[in-house]
Amino acid sequence: MSDSKEPRLQQLGLLEEEQLRGVGFRQTRGYKSLAGCLGHGPLVLQLLSFTLLAGLLVQVSKVPSSLSQGQSKQDAIYQNLTQLKAAVSELSEKSKLQEIYQELTRLKAAVGELPEKSKLQEIYQELTRLKAAVGELPEKSKQQEIYQELTQLKAAVDGLPDRSKQQEIYQELTQLKAAVDGLPDRSKQQEIYQELIQLKAAVERLCRPCPWEWTFFQGNCYFMSNSQRNWHNSITACQEVGAQLVVIKSAEEQNFLQLQSSRSNRFTWMGLSDLNHEGTWQWVDGSPLLPSFKQYWNKGEPNNIGEEDCAEFSGNGWNDDKCNLAKFWICKKSAASCSGDEERLLSPAPTTPNPPPE
């Protein structure tokens, strides 16, 4: 009975093929090719992945590149940083490394397109958190990729704006360098260390108006001491760094300095005294105290009780006090000018910050 079925099945197969031809269906080469591909699952996945990546690149290329339309870039960068933060927060010792590496790659590309003043505060905060997370990475992961990323990041830092958060960036780099010293003696450790040294030097060479630990205001740099000296020694401390015990030239400068002093709740020397002639107040640069500045004395001051010949910031105004008393002090000097990239590149990098000796 099985022998009689085979001719019948062959006849049915021929009939079905004829019917398919009747409605215009043919087994084309493309159809056969697709059938062949479906037998190779990994290859199909690769083709689909390539198609998706190509579409993503097309979409990225449509992001506006002009500075006036830079907001979309900034938002994308900020989203990438947020995703990176989330990935880092979920780290176990040997997981999520591939995701972090991919996020770092995208972040590097985004930093290269940053306008000069966009999202710097957010980037700084994310870098701070990332530094802490890097210290928890397993000993052997992605060192070669990290080395390459640091090399390219150094070039990106060279394009950062000259000011904005330089002090914080410098401190973060210093701490990161110390963390690298504790890495296991694995591949590329020496190269990573050298890259960090060069990156730190590049940040130090960025043109900045004031040295580290000084405050910039209206073309001048101010150093607020953290130790105390008498009035004469305060003058010496400022002179040793090419500055002067502060001489106030305008109402705006007075308001700025008074605010700094009152916030810290400190008694602070200024460069004003009547040592040469009682009752005739004179600045350390030889200029007299203008009548319009007398309004800044506290009520009842100066009163010269017990030979009080030197002026200080006290509360919300000025007070006269004995010059031999130890108090905080403020130094002032002109800010550096930055004429362009040539001056920035030629200026030597300081080996250490240079506040007055305390």
Swiss-Prot record:
GO CC terms in record: membrane
Motif window: Endocytosis signal: 14-15, 16-18, 31-34
Region (5 X approximate tandem repeats): 96-280
SMART domains named among the record's database cross-references: CLECT
GO molecular function terms attached to this record: D-mannose binding; metal ion binding
Record topology, Extracellular segments: 59-358
Membrane topology of the entry: Single-pass type II membrane protein
Principal place of residence: membrane
Segments on the Cytoplasmic side according to the record's topology features: 1-37
Sequence repeats: 96-118, 119-141, 142-164, 165-187, 188-211
Annotated TM spans: 38-58
Binding site for Ca(2+): 301, 303, 305, 308, 319-320
Start and end residues of each stretch annotated as Disordered: 336-358
Complex formation: Homotetramer. Interacts with C1QBP; the interaction is indicative for a C1q:C1QBP:CD209 signaling complex. Interacts with ICAM2 and ICAM3 by binding to mannose-like carbohydrates. Interacts (via C-type lectin domain) with CEACAM1 (via Lewis X moieties); this interaction is regulated by the glycosylation pattern of CEACAM1 on cell types and regulates contact between dendritic cells and neutrophils.
Entry protein name: CD209 antigen
Organism listed in the record: Papio hamadryas (Hamadryas baboon)
